[in-house]
Amino acid sequence: MDFELKTLTRTLICNEKADALIVLIPEGLTAGDDALSVLAALAIKSGDLEVKPGKLLNAYRVTGIAATRVLLVGAGDASPKSVRTAVNAAMGALKAGNNVQRAVLCLNALPTLQPEAVRAAIVACSETAYAYTTTKSKPAAAKLQQMVVAVDGLANAQAGFDKAVGLAKGIELAKEWANRPANHATPTLLAGAAKELGKLPRIKTEVLGPKEIEKLGMGAFLAVAQGTAEPLRFIVLRYEGAAKAEAPVVLIGKGITFDTGGISIKPAAEMDEMKFDMCGAASVLGTFRALAELQPGLNVVGLIPACENMPGDRAIKPGDVVTSMSGQTIEILNTDAEGRLVLCDALTYAARLKPRAVVDIATLTGACVVALGGVRSGLFSNNEALAESLARAGESSLDPCWRMPLDDDYAEGLKSNFADVANVAGRAGGAVTAAKFLQRFAADFAWAHLDIAGTAWKSGAAKGATGRPVALLLDFLLGQVQAVPAAQPVKASPKTRPARKSTPAAKTRA
């Protein structure tokens, strides 16, 4: 979908030709004598329209308005969250139709236009319009081709617009790779996606194969991949936005491209959803896509340990002991607790980079789903400042997380008679004990763990990846920029140039 940011008064909006005009109506709408303001005032007065977020009123062929269809949508207090709810409702109504190719989203009625509200509106448009088509033989063409975002002025809107377009591209890439079936998203293919990102401004990609991984001593990662014929890959992405001497923020994404559970095999029901076990990796790819678009001034490294967890004839067995890259030995009591095994070696690798902070992202535990459901991701950290930064980013990006405990007492269950540590500690507090396991490998740097098992995808009729937590990660990274000297801007090719315009109208595609 193409997005265009355009300065339009309410009067000019009435003259804008479009298949649909979406108008967000907040509490305390200011009066006006243009056709749009009159229509909204009459609808509210008659009781046909509520300003509660998401409430809709459709009108067709309104006198004085050039658009074929007008959707008045309640936006409540006009907060970013209310704006998102309103736009989701409007886009849902448009998606049900067949003839909308060009739409105008009017934000002029909002009392104070915050950049965050503009971002929320555009991301909601992009996410609602997204449809997975990669493995369909006859994919339906997207109906909606252009969305004009109408504002009173660019001063407050431009920053939110630029950020939203970059974020939308990142979320879409994360969704695309997470939604792909496992045979279309193998570790090798995932590495190929990372190499494509390496063609974008400031991004470099390195892919390590089995021999290089073995040479590094990543025994835990190698152990997980023993049961599959698909070769494992260790993917390293580097975004270079600051001086080389500046320590990077490291993002680690769990990349289990399909998880059967191994010898500790999962139940057959809903096992197809285990293609989503690489959503952590997908979120790292998506975040790097957004970084390439926005070009912030900091250094970021992405690490993706990618492999399958299969019950082949060489698969690890319950009771096996393996040696991790750190030198610590691990007793594998449950082969379905494989995510922490690939992550622990990635954490040890991250220490070599002398990072300013490390954040790992993983669909790690069903226990986190039980604790937090699908609303908030679980946040664990050994550093207060890092945890606070991530929590703030979650709130500001509408991609929230919740801080979970890391008391040392939780580690008692990880003790082993046969190794330095066991990979599981029983059912009680499973999300916390998994994080305690990872913490053993993050003693030398500020570290946080995001358990996205409940937020990375949806089941049922709406089955599919959510693209979370790309929004959280991007806001977190942008918040780190002020402390880092920026490198000189990199000129992008026309296909990848960030959408930053000083003219009254800016066009871009997400």
UniProtKB/Swiss-Prot annotation:
Mn(2+) 2 binds at K254, D259, D277, E338. Keywords: Aminopeptidase, Cytoplasm, Hydrolase, Manganese, Metal-binding, Protease. One of its GO terms (cellular component) is cytoplasm. The keyword Metal-binding applies. GO terms for biological process: proteolysis. It is found in: Cytoplasm. Mn(2+) 1 binds at D259, D336, E338. CDD domains: Peptidase_M17. Its cofactor is Mn(2+). It catalyses: Release of an N-terminal amino acid, Xaa-|-Yaa-, in which Xaa is preferably Leu, but may be other amino acids including Pro although not Arg or Lys, and Yaa may be Pro. Amino acid amides and methyl esters are also readily hydrolyzed, but rates on arylamides are exceedingly low; Release of an N-terminal amino acid, preferentially leucine, but not glutamic or aspartic acids. Residues 487-510 are annotated as: Disordered. It comes from the Bacteria. PROSITE patterns: CYTOSOL_AP (PS00631). Its main location: cytoplasm. Binds 2 manganese ions per subunit. It holds the Pfam family Peptidase_M17. GO terms for molecular function: manganese ion binding; metalloaminopeptidase activity. The keyword Protease applies. Its EC number is 3.4.11.1, 3.4.11.10. Presumably involved in the processing and regular turnover of intracellular proteins. Catalyzes the removal of unsubstituted N-terminal amino acids from various peptides. HAMAP family: Cytosol_peptidase_M17 (MF_00181). PANTHER family: CYTOSOL AMINOPEPTIDASE, LEUCINE AMINOPEPTIDASE-RELATED. Belongs to the peptidase M17 family. This is Probable cytosol aminopeptidase. The gene is pepA.
